From Swiss-Prot:
GO molecular function, one term: translation initiation factor activity
Protein name in the entry: Eukaryotic translation initiation factor 3 subunit J-B
Coiled coil regions in record: 30-127
Keywords, alphabetical: Coiled coil, Cytoplasm, Initiation factor, Protein biosynthesis
Chain positions covered by the region annotation Disordered: 1-75, 214-235
Coiled coil as UniProt keyword: yes
Main location group: cytoplasm
InterPro entries: eIF3-like_dom_sf (IPR023194), eIF3j (IPR013906)
Keyword Protein biosynthesis: yes
Amino acid sequence: MADSDEWDADNFEPNEPIKIATAGRLDRWEGEDEEEDVKDNWDDEEEEKEEEKKVEQKIAEVKPPEKKKLSDKIKEKELLQKKKQEELKKNQETAASESLTLEEQLAEKARLKKLQEEADMELAREAFGVDPAAANASTTVNTTNASGIEAMCPSSKDDFVTFEKLLKEKITQFEKSVHYPSFLESLFRELCISLEVDDLKKISTSLSVLLTEKQKQEKEKKANKKKKKGVVPGGGLKANMKDDFADYGGFDGGYGNEYDDFM
């Protein structure tokens, strides 16, 4: 009996580890339930982040665009101006390379100049928000504020009168030069190439009248020089007096003959 009791005791002791192992298995399953709760929390956080992003995007869409600074506008204007000038320069080089007559070249230059002025005006309007009516009004030059020929952009008759005076003052500074006459001849010819025939006739008539007046003045100067020479050999003052009386019949066939007839 003692052996059977010992066997029973031996068989009884191993039961406790089995219970512990079973308990261990139960604890492991309980941990799995907790992990599932953590995953659910992560999903909630991700959904909240997505909602926050959507709200931020809506706020960014509703937010009005910021106004550009004046310095940024000026930089944009300079870039556009540079690009426009490069295009105009390229067009000028292309026009010069072609076989054009002098008149056609001048017309092309005038066209390109007009395009450049229009482009400058358009850039100013876009960059600074200038009213088109105000921009057109500003093309009329205020002569009191003009700083020289470069500042002139004549459009009215009075503007051209002022422009004429400034050009005259500029050009006549060099009238003492020996090259001045040839310079004017070439300048007038180049300036008059694009004119119509009727306009050329007016200019030609005006210059012809000026030539006649200058010739008349020159003759008068020569006559005055001769009178200032004084007594001329071969009769002098008496001879001149005799010539004056000769206009009224002279000494031979004038008053003397009338006196003989009376007698």
